[in-house]
Amino acid sequence: MPSWKGQSRGNVLGYKIFVFTLKHLGLSFAYFILVFVAFYYFLFSNKSSKSTYYYFREILKYSSFKAKWNVYKNYFVFGQILLDKFAILGGLKGKFSYNLDGEHHLRQMASNTGGIIINAHIGNFEIAGQLLERLNTKINVLMLDAEHQNIKKYLTNVMVNRDVQIIPIQADYSHIVPISEALINKELIAMAGDRFIEESKVVEIDFMGQKAVFPTGPFYLAARFGVPVTFAFAMKESRTHYHFFASPPEKVERYKDPEKQEKELKRFVEKFACEFERIIKMYPLQWFNYYQFWKEE
């Protein structure tokens, strides 16, 4: 069964290089450098390129040439996303414009019970916490990454908005404690719904024409703590403009009957997958999925 091994593309050294380039050379020059960086990854990152090619060729049905060209473009856009993220985290938010579609849904959650924001590795959701600072609530981002400790330290140093807190997922499940505390305090928890690691509880559904496996964990947490979920994405629409989407909050019911509970969790996974697929089709270059996702691959 395809599962993620706990490591995203990019590391602390890469993040430091991005920040240095932004501070000393500017965003435009950093974008120019990406032309060559993206080409390097296109040539030498065989495993991630294979998965991305499969996505464009077999799922989106692009021609072979178009699929290969879009693999390169995907790396380039991913680099832009990282640069934008650090520009905003480092205090350059004024260089970007954005429209918020569904901000009132998050405001509703923040003013009532708090809740869970379920996103994916698409677009640039990490910047949403900085853009949504006017919600006047803390946003906690779960980081599912093997390098989370070092990245957390570095991100903490460069972030301007301290209302964004990174919670690294731990093997001993000790991350449940800060999650519980955050939800008790009516804060927001943001976590990805398109990744899972081995031994995670999952469900198999139809996704973009093929069978795929999604985690039920985010929805189980919502049911356990009695808080609503919303699906949210922050998508790059032009060089310096982003569009934020958030769906109406919904409550995941908690049942004593295991069979009923599993059906409820699967129902919400399918809802998320449906919205996720809609966003992917609108912004096909911005899904940064660098591992085997579909079972047929």
What do the PLM-derived regions correspond to, one by one?
Residues 1-119, 163:
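Membrane-anchoring hydrophobic helices of lipid-metabolizing enzymes
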Residues 103-107, 129, 133, 152-156, ...:
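Short amphipathic alpha-helical segments and helix-helix/interface helices
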